[in-house]
Amino acid sequence: GVELTLNSLVSGLLKQNHFINVVAPFNSKLSDNCSSANLYTVKGEEQISWQHQDYSTETKISESSIVSKMIAKALSLTKDCDAIINLSYDLLPICKTLEVDYPILHLISMGDESLEIKNIISKVYAKHPNNFAFHTRSQASDYPFIKDPIILGNGFEISQYTFQEKKEGPLAWVGRVSPEKGLEDAVYVASKLGEELNVWGFIEDKKYASRIEELYPSGQICWKGYLKTKE
């Protein structure tokens, strides 16, 4: 998801001769086609993803959190840069847009998963509408105050993929296996077409995966596991 978006975005900007710094959690690596970017990694306390919390959960940000450390590092590198591009769906980077005299741009990759984040997006968007972009219009519609969303679709490094010219199945589905991803819709389509569905991705919610399997005949879903792009 975000990892692929980041590598594609960095690769595309490098091809246009931009100077890029990337700030990421400790042990992160960039893909080979992003090797000319500067990678800065930071250690910190991880937090639970927003899609796994209640909609009304209030944010608790500690100074030791990975998000706090990353935004602090990014701000320390602004002397030689034009802007910060934030790819995290998190409260702190969005709040910072109003607190610092430096452009922070946000690529929002999720729908409305948190009331608190929705409210801060609304507050910041009112003053800086051009600082936000979304992946799809459907996703942006989760935020009714966004009147004319900037849409930035996911780019792909085409050279890393091999085109398969096949008119017959099986069908493929790629993504983390958890309820918000909607795998059941893909299985439904495959069953209506009489095709097997190959599923690539980390099975985060095993109970969810089992429930879907029980709804369809044996062999309808073929679990392929979690692979790197090159695989």
What residue ranges belong to the model's regions?
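Catalytic cores of nucleotide-sugar-dependent glycosyltransferases that transfer UDP/GDP/TDP-activated
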Residues: G1-E231
